Amino acid sequence: MNTLVLKIDAVLSKHLKKQLASYTISSQNTYVAFAAKKNGVTVLLYKSGKLVLQGNGANALAQELNLPVAKTVFEASNNSQDIPIIGSDEVGNGSYFGGIAVVASFVDPKDHSFLKKLGVDDSKKLSDKTIQQIAPLLEKQIPHQSLLLSPKKYNELVGKSKPYNAISIKVALHNQAIFLLLQKGIQPKQIVIDAFTSQSNYEKHLKKEKNHFPNPLTFQEKAESHYLAVAVSSIIARNLFLDNLDQLGQDLGYQLPSGAGSASDKVASQLLAAYGMSSLEYSAKLHFANTHKAQALLTK
């Protein structure tokens, strides 16, 4: 997917709106003055005058609309690494035990040599031991913002008749991590989120969040395999999640498994027998099916 970003004046903005009048879509982003989608390409015109085209046909649509692409456009493909980028990723959302760690990291081209020497890659391809070794080095060298939502707080916020669901809570965490990193004076040319939902759904949930920023976002599936900034965030987040899982286990006197398989059911049933439901409220995500499975194991 390509992302084209350019600055246009009021005259061209008016002309663009006229050309795309029959293709308009809604946008929950308060900084967007006009939004449209044509030929699979999302067009966002910001109040600042910045125009963003996202989609595989971005170049073709830009030419069709007679936009000054050659002079003012910045083009970013999946493999673009030669610009300063913020990348955001989360770990823990698929695990019954443990919280959710979300990290946004800022990687400048000058950091590439350091990162490659460390062997930074998709954290899902790295062993936990390797992650725990290199994460502290990344935290020291790379500007980043880490957030950890504990299981206890997660259970207060996520579930039926509660403020968030499993998707909207991640929108809130990613948005806050990026917002706080930008508040430190970071100036990225691109912000990439490892896509966990569609852009339209992300913006729908974003509407109820307090903090917003004008920078356009790029949503990329498996972004940690394409962007070093996202890979860095993935590694730091994984380490944060593992530390939290270990601490929760120490607090309860049990080794808590990662994931949501049968091992989690077994440990959860042991915790229920030893301490009752309060132990799962403290250490696990209650809305997962593992809770009912653990309760069923107690009756056998």
From Swiss-Prot:
It is found in: Cytoplasm. It is an enzyme of class 3 (hydrolase). One of its GO terms (molecular function) is RNA-DNA hybrid ribonuclease activity. A divalent metal cation binds at residues 89-90, 194. Its cofactor is Mn(2+); Mg(2+). GO terms for biological process: DNA replication, removal of RNA primer; mismatch repair. It catalyses: Endonucleolytic cleavage to 5'-phosphomonoester. Keywords: Cytoplasm, Endonuclease, Hydrolase, Magnesium, Metal-binding, Nuclease. It comes from the Bacteria. Coiled coil: none annotated. GO terms for cellular component: cytoplasm; ribonuclease H2 complex. Its EC number is 3.1.26.4. Manganese or magnesium. Binds 1 divalent metal ion per monomer in the absence of substrate. May bind a second metal ion after substrate binding. Residues 83-300 form the RNase H type-2 domain. PANTHER family: RIBONUCLEASE, RIBONUCLEASE H2 SUBUNIT A. Belongs to the RNase HII family. RnhC subfamily. Endonuclease that specifically degrades the RNA of RNA-DNA hybrids. This is Ribonuclease HIII. The lineage of its organism: Bacteria, Bacillati, Bacillota, Bacilli, Lactobacillales.
